[in-house]
Amino acid sequence: MGLLEEYKNAHIIEKIISNIYLFNRFNSVYLFGSLLLNDRLKISDVDILLVYDLFSNDILDSEKLIRSKLNCLTGYEIDLIILSSSELEELHFLDKLYSKYLKIK
């Protein structure tokens, strides 16, 4: 398991990572929220931040596919936040997570 052994929900994280192809359209992908808590019972959903450089309509298609596929794989609601690289910086989104995120791409 390696880097993921610190997470009690590593089996869910591994399912997401094993389907990394779903995120090909995005430059960066981060997991955050209750999935990363070390409590298997408190997962409310799977929070994923997707970062892109240039917007195009295929982002919307990718969003639907990611949500559907990962919901089936994990059994949890998939909450996606999609930001451009510039929005990510302007909003300081990662700073607001206080390093409680896992970059998977």
Where are these regions (language model features)?
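Catalytic core of pol beta-like nucleotidyltransferases
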Residues: 1-30, 36-43, 52-105
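Amphipathic, hydrophobic secondary-structure cores in small proteins
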Residues: 46-48
